[in-house]
Amino acid sequence: MENCRTPTNKTQITLNRTPTLKERRWNTLKVNTTNVRCSTPIFGNFRSPNLSPIESMGTKKSPVSPMRFAFKKPPAKAHPHPHQHQHHHHHHKHIHRTQLKPPPFILPKPQEEIIEPEREIKICSSPDTFSDDSNMETSLVVESRRRSIKASNHSYVVNHAANVEQILMHMGLENYVTNFEEAHIDLVKLASMERADLVKIGLNADEDCNRIMDVLQTL
């Protein structure tokens, strides 16, 4: 037990430690707090990794050049002869106008505007309408042709219609279908009807009676 005992000799051990207020060693730190950021004190050669100087952004240059340098004007060339300069300016102006002028764009005419002049040319150039340039005769010929075409259309519908209802629908008089059905009028009776017969079954409008009589006259 004599060999195993706690040593009693006093020994001074020097260890690195953080400066304390007792030793007043913190006064040796020279840090400009207005221009330096630090989160831990600086002592000797020890510096905090969070230490960074504060610099004004105005003194730094942007790595990207301003846009105004990208649009620099080309260096001025020697001025040519005045006559050559005028000729070149006139030629350049002429090229600029001819090249940048948009091509003319013409809208196509509607189909109705193309068909109507062709009809008028055919009517005026036909031998039936040849006259002494009288407007009245021309209008009469046009009206007679219109009526003949209308009559041919009516006769085609009447000849190919299956019943009276189809004829009335062709003339736009489908409202009177019930009147003809109640009177038991078929295609044979319709062809022999007169204006008084139409009034009897309820067709009181003169315009409607005239339209039906025009169709019956074409038969």
UniProtKB/Swiss-Prot annotation:
Gene: mtrm
SAM domain residues: 159-219
Keyword match Cell cycle: yes
Segments passing through the bilayer: none
Task of the protein: Polo kinase inhibitor required to maintain G2 arrest in the meiotic cell cycle in females. Holds heterochromatically paired homologs together from the end of pachytene until metaphase I. Haploinsufficient locus for homologous achiasmate segregation and may be required for the maintenance of heterochromatic pairings.
Pfam families: SAM_2
GO biological process, one term: female meiosis chromosome segregation
Origin species: Drosophila yakuba (Fruit fly)
Name of protein: Protein matrimony
Biased composition (Basic residues): 74-99
Assigned keywords, A-Z: Cell cycle, Chromosome, DNA-binding, Meiosis, Nucleus, Ubl conjugation
Annotated region (Disordered), positions in chain: 74-104
PTM description: Probably ubiquitinated: degraded during the oocyte-to-embryo transition by the anaphase promoting complex/cyclosome (APC/C) containing cort protein.
One CC-aspect GO term: nucleus
Keyword hit for Nucleus: yes
Organism taxonomic ancestry: Eukaryota, Metazoa, Ecdysozoa, Arthropoda, Hexapoda
Subunit structure: Interacts with polo. Interacts with cort.
Subcellular location: Nucleus; Chromosome
Gene Ontology MF annotations: DNA binding
